[in-house]
């Protein structure tokens, strides 16, 4: 027997075919969300308050400092927040200190700074009652970038850009005449030497001494019209502020504020880290030949002689000397923007491949401290030096798509940036109030206005592109949404501008971003998924784990290092499936490995690291596809994406053929309930589990406190499916930390169960499975195999109107008693009532405008003291095509103190309707390999082809769907699934390390099946065997969210667009089917004149004709001739508005009057207020 049995959770054993043992457990899959938010609460908030403190007034007398903060208890717990449409948030209280410097008085106060949304344990936020996810954003890291470009004459040119986190960009570029220019903040370009002079290197000789002599520098100096620092400062000021009178002082303060003021310019810690990495000498001298010795500044000894070529070993040896600033120089700059001395490191090297032995100077930025978040003059000089070095052939250009140059902004940082915007707006208000208020009686509370802070947080959670309504179709969809990486959003790319290169798979994605899972369509490659083992480091770069190879013994050690993409570029990495002996040494002399972008074969002595697992390349969703290695990547992409659209079934079933990922994905998704502590189960009910903690002290175990775990029962998920949790533990079980206590939707015994295992035959059947269609047995309908439960929510509000309040009541004008049969005395539908479309759910009346009373009404009013009520019926009805059983009704009243109701609403009623949807013709099904199709026919069980033992098969798929799609994984799954079913086992075939051909065939033999996996099938209609043997097996098939019930739509009359008077489009607007230009051509080609006429008039925008037609149909009369379509009038009006005199003439050249439609012609037109989601105001024609 191939494979070994592995336990997944408490209840499931699987035969696992993996050959490579797991050396590292998968991390918690949603830690990218939870860790980032924890960092924000622990450090991010304090960091921001520190940045903004102190706020001083214009005189410097008052100073406001933010000392400390604390989060209080949330007003509503999680469940209550969802029920009340509230935000799950805690009050943020900040300790603020006001110092009055004149008197030395200090006032301290705790100030309320608004409610701050809290993250749930499962990595989501509840905002206005809805669960939302903050997606991490992939952005360009702040740093110095060098880029190579070819000009129109075919010459190599370079440009460089210093990109900060916030602040002005600095760019260098060359032109056709070999002059180097600089651009400050995207303005017009200046010769580079102008900026150097402005920094204090005033004479030509100083500049040449600094950067070393070369022709580019000489050309630039010739072009430069300035001669000293003052002239350079004035020149820069004129470029940046044209039209303003330049003075030296103004120019200095402008340059200072652009680059050296920490409030205006911020590299952030990641920018400082990347800049130091790029510009420090230790990274730039690699493989260079020295033209001067390197001297230890402290001892004066020569560490490396002139003429030495510095390889990696040599650089490692002298690293300490380089870091302690060997060969450093300090320049005292006078009259420049910054008065402090500038320290740089400079070493002369020989220009590579130069026969004349010329030298060039490599200048480093002398490694400024990581606390320095601004750019320094040393950075600017070093970046210029790098640019000149590139022109001499020293150094590398950057690949912007490399993950070493792209970083993640996770929840914490996105929130911090948003909070910072709010705080800076608040800072302005505080300054203004300081100058107005009386210093004697002033308190911190009076100075601070928290509105801008609250507004910016609300805006971020409510309407940012990165704050998304959680995809809750199934646990995998939840999990993937939390691990999603988007390159879109504020400060990111836009769909239209993103090039092919950005979207493409890059070698640095290996183990960091999934190369397979990305949406099809305009977002392809811009939205990605985090790989299974990847994590995010403190700078926001994605790291992936590798096993370290001992450099002396060349054996694999137990040490696991997490490497970022640019760190990995220095190492040779062996594949996870390299053969090792029992001591961890490579068995082959030549090993398949990766170095930078190349897959090569190298000697085993050259290996530095080895992959931890074959599945570290792919994301959690992709890792759920068995036999992924046998599928084409495009189909695998569809398979990964479609698993997220699977509808939770009534009776879910875990796959016979899994990958071992099902348990982990289900546990971490947040849909299951997991134990927060080790303990013993004391009580189990369908809606609650009680666990007594077991605590170990001094080796003795004793009982601790009791944990309660409430279960969600038949709740509505974000995508309208049923969210229900079922216990899978029994009283007395001892559960470990993080063990699954209760299954969520689409789960079975602690494993993800998105679909069902069904018996599938690859065969055609009367052409019903043409074009990927699926033929299904009626058994799957009868036995509720693919039945799902759907819950829809409808709400009705009673508001205050100008004419009086709306009322929820049973007393509705002009409605028969039979229409009210499901309503209780309040006018609200009973729980358990069965309703169909058009039925009243909540009776509601709205006051009409008061009209002049008739004499009779005045008499009635005088007698009964009440006039006949002028109200119209605005009841909530079941929309077209919906219906089901009323599951729950929630009523919120303002009188009962429901402060969560929005202003103007007195009462809110929510009705939940549940539907049980069996599978239909027209529903979409798929497997896990991108093999999707629509059900074309449901065949009676007795007519389905049957196996030799008489069992009918469940589904027939077209064999032509396999060869051209190249997803052979489905065939292997089919055979292995059948073997597993016959053996009564579950199997796991992990990606890239699963069952191979031999394993599959040996398991088939073990199950007693035919060697080729095929069987004779008999036609259920005739009892005859089919001509050839057929591949029959068990495949895991899912029912997708694209259900025909949601798409079926029909209309006779309905709302019309206001201007063109044509029917609206789309099911949501109850619209019609568009008959477009090409369809008109088709009818013209057939000469179907009358059909064409009625389609373009009565059925579209002939307002008079359609009313008369409706009347004629009702009365059984002949239909009258059509009149002029409204769109023709619109066209005439448009031409007339252009100043053209347009008239319509008949055959006798008499003008036809184009009068507007008279209201008498139309029976009744009313603006349809219920259709509030339609794009324009509609008019509806009623009989």
UniProtKB/Swiss-Prot annotation:
It comes from the Bacteria. HAMAP family: RNApol_bact_RpoB (MF_01321). Pfam families: RNA_pol_Rpb2_1 (PF04563), RNA_pol_Rpb2_2 (PF04561), RNA_pol_Rpb2_3 (PF04565), RNA_pol_Rpb2_45 (PF10385), RNA_pol_Rpb2_6 (PF00562), RNA_pol_Rpb2_7 (PF04560). It catalyses: RNA(n) + a ribonucleoside 5'-triphosphate = RNA(n+1) + diphosphate. GO terms for cellular component: DNA-directed RNA polymerase complex. This is DNA-directed RNA polymerase subunit beta. Belongs to the RNA polymerase beta chain family. Its EC number is 2.7.7.6. SUPFAM superfamilies: beta and beta-prime subunits of DNA dependent RNA-polymerase (SSF64484). InterPro entries: DNA-dir_RNA_pol_bsu_ext_1_sf, DNA-dir_RNA_pol_bsu_external_1, DNA-dir_RNA_pol_su2, DNA-dir_RNAP_su2_dom, DNA-dir_RNAP_su2_hyb_sf, RNA_pol_bsu_bac, RNA_pol_bsu_CS, RNA_pol_bsu_protrusion. Coiled coil: none annotated. The RNAP catalytic core consists of 2 alpha, 1 beta, 1 beta' and 1 omega subunit. When a sigma factor is associated with the core the holoenzyme is formed, which can initiate transcription. It is an enzyme of class 2 (transferase). NCBIfam families: PRK00405.1, rpoB. GO terms for molecular function: DNA binding; DNA-directed RNA polymerase activity; ribonucleoside binding.
């Amino acid at each position: 027997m191939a494979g070994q049995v592995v336990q997944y959770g408490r209840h499931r054993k699987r035969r696992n075919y993996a050959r490579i043992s797991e050396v590292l457990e998968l991390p918690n899959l949603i830690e990218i969300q939870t860790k980032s938010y924890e960092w924000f609460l622990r450090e991010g908030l304090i960091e921001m308050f520190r940045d903004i403190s102190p706020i001083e007034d214009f005189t410097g007398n008052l100073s406001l400092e933010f000392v400390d903060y604390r989060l209080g208890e949330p007003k509503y717990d999680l469940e209550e927040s969802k029920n009340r449409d509230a935000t799950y948030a805690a009050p943020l209280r900040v300790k603020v200190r006001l110092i009055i410097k004149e008197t030395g008085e200090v006032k301290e106060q705790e100030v309320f700074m608004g409610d701050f949304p809290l993250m749930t344990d499962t990595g989501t936020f509840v905002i206005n009652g809805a669960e939302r996810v903050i997606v991490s954003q992939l952005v360009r890291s702040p740093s110095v970038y060098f880029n190579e470009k070819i000009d129109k004459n075919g010459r190599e040119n370079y440009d460089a850009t210093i990109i900060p986190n916030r602040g002005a960009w600095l760019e260098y570029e060359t032109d056709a005449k070999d002059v180097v220019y600089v651009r400050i903040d995207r303005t017009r370009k200046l010769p580079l030497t102008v900026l150097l002079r402005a920094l204090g290197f005033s004479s030509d000789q100083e500049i040449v001494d600094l950067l070393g002599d070369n022709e580019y520098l000489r050309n630039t100096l010739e072009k430069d019209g300035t001669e000293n620092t003052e002239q350079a400062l004035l020149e820069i000021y004129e470029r940046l502020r044209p039209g303003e009178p330049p003075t030296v002082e103004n120019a200095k303060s402008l340059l200072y504020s652009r680059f050296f003021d920490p409030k205006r310019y911020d590299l952030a810690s990641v920018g400082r880290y990347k800049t130091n990495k790029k510009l420090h000498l230790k990274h730039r001298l690699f493989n260079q030949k020295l033209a001067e010795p390197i001297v230890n500044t402290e001892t004066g000894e020569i560490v490396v002689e002139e003429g030495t070529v510095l390889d990696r070993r040599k650089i490692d040896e002298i690293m300490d000397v380089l870091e302690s600033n060997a060969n450093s120089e300090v320049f005292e700059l006078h009259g420049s923007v910054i008065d402090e001395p500038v320290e740089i490191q400079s070493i002369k090297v020989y220009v590579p491949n130069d026969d004349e032995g010329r030298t060039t100077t490599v200048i480093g930025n002398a490694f400024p401290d990581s606390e320095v978040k601004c750019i320094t003059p040393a950075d600017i000089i070093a970046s210029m030096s790098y640019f000149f070095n590139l022109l001499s052939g020293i150094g590398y250009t950057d690949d912007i798509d490399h993950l070493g140059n792209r970083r993640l902004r996770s929840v914490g940082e996105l929130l911090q940036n948003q909070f910072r915007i709010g705080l800076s707006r608040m800072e302005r208000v505080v300054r203004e109030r300081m100058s107005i208020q009386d210093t004697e009686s002033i308190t911190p509370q009076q100075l601070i206005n928290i509105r801008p802070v609250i507004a910016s947080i609300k805006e971020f959670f409510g309407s940012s592109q990165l704050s998304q309504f959680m995809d809750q179709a199934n646990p995998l969809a939840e999990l993937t949404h939390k691990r999603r990486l988007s390159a879109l959003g504020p400060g990111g790319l836009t769909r239209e501008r993103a090039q092919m290169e950005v979207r493409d798979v890059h070698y640095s994605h290996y183990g960091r971003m999934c190369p397979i899972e990305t949406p099809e369509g305009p977002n392809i490659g811009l939205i990605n998924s985090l790989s299974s083992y990847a994590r995010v480091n403190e700078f926001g770069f994605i790291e992936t784990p590798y096993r370290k190879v001992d450099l002396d013994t060349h054996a694999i050690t137990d040490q696991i290092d997490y490497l970022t993409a640019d760190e990995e570029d220095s190492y040779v990495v062996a594949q996870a499936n390299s053969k090792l002996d029992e001591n961890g040494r490579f068995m082959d002399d030549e090993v398949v490995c990766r170095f930078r972008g190349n897959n090569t074969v190298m000697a085993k002595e050259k290996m530095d690291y080895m992959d931890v697992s074959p599945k570290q390349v792919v994301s959690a969703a992709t890792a759920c596809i068995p036999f992924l290695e046998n599928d084409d990547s495009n189909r695998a992409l569809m398979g990964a994406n479609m698993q997220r659209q699977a509808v939770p079934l009534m009776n879910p079933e875990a796959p016979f053929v899994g990958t071992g990922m099902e348990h982990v994905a289900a546990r971490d998704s947040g849909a299951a309930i997991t134990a927060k502590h080790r303990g013993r189960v004391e009580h189990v009910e369908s809606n609650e589990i009680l666990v007594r903690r077991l605590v170990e002290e001094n080796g003795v175990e004793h009982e601790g406190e009791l944990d309660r775990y409430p279960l969600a029962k038949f709740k509505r998920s974000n995508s309208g499916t049923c969210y229900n949790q079922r216990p899978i533990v029994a009283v007395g079980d001892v559960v470990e930390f993080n063990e699954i206590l209760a299954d969520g939707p689409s789960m079975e015994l602690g494993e993800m169960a998105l679909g069902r295992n069904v018996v599938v035959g690859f065969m055609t059947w009367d052409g019903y499975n043409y074009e990927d269609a699926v033929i299904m047995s009626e058994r799957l309908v009868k036995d509720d195999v693919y039945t799902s439960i759907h819950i829809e929510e409808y709400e009705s509000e009673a508001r205050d109107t100008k004419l009086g309040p709306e009322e929820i009541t049973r007393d509705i004008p002009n409605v028969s008693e039979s229409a009210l049969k499901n309503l209780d005395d309040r006018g609200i539908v009973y729980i358990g009532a069965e309703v169909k479309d058009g039925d009243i759910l909540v009776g509601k009346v709205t006051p009409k405008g008061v009209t002049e009373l008739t004499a009779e009404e005045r008499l009635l009013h005088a007698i009964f003291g009440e006039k006949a009520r002028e109200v119209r019926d605005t009841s909530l009805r079941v929309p077209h095509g919906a219906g089901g059983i009323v599951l729950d009704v929630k009523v919120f009243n303002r009188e009962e103190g429901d402060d969560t109701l929005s202003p103007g609403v007195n009462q809110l009623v929510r009705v939940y309707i549940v539907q049980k949807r069996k599978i239909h013709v027209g529903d979409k099904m798929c497997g896990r390999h991108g093999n999707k199709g629509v059900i074309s026919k449901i065949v009676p069980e007795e007519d389905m082809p049957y196996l030799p033992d008489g069992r009918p098969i469940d589904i027939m798929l077209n064999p032509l769907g396999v060869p051209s799609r190249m997803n052979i994984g489905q065939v292997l799954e089919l055979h292995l699934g059948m073997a597993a079913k016959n053996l009564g086992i579950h199997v796991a075939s992990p990606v890239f390390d699963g069952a191979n051909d031999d394993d599959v065939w040996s398991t088939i033999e073990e199950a007693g099946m035919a060697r080729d996996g095929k069987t004779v099938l008999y036609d259920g209609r005739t009892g005859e065997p089919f001509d050839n043997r057929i591949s029959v097996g068990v495949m895991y098939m899912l029912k997708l969210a694209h259900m025909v019930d949601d798409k079926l739509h029909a209309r006779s009359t309905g709302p019309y667009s206001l201007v063109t008077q044509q029917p609206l489009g789309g099911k949501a607007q109850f619209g019609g089917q568009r008959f477009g230009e090409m369809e008109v051509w088709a009818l013209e080609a057939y000469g179907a004149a009358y059909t064409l006429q009625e389609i373009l008039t009565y059925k579209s925008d002939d307002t008079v004709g359609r009313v008369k037609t409706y009347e004629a149909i009702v009365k059984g009369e002949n239909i009258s001739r059509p009149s002029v379509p409204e769109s023709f009038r619109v066209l005439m009006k448009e031409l007339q508005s252009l100043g053209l005199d347009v008239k319509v003439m008949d055959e006798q050249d008499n003008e036809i009057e184009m009068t507007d439609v008279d209201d008498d012609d139309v029976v009744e037109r009313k603006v349809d207020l219920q259709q509030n989601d339609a794009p324009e105001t509609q008019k509806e024609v009623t009989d």
